[in-house]
Amino acid sequence: MLPNIGDVIASMIDYNHGCPELINHALKVYAFAKGIGEKEEITREKMKTLETAAVLHDIGIRVSEEKYESFSGKYQQIEGPPLARELLTKLEFDKKIIDRVCFLIAHDHILRNAE
């Protein structure tokens, strides 16, 4: 069975267990991203990438806090992509989507080169 956004959301919730603020934030960003993607009528593949990146965009916060005692965007951009890659690989996502999601997470706090 192909992975879907529900699988990503469930994995994000498991990973962020005990941090309802992170879970709620990810779900809010997902809802906004989904709405924007639908309004823009993007392709199915781009929608899957957008939704996945939205759910996982802050996945590096917890490890950043542990390693650097900070959840600054620069640390999230370092720590988030490897976590997202591991999670999405376990879910058997297509490599092209994994690579794009990781790129977007690595550029989450940068306002250029993320088209």
Over which residues does each language-model region extend?
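Acidic/His-rich, divalent-metal-binding segments that scaffold phosphate/diphosphate chemistry
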Residues: 1-64, 70-73
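Divalent metal-dependent catalytic cores for phosphoryl transfer on phosphate-bearing substrates
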Residues: 48-115
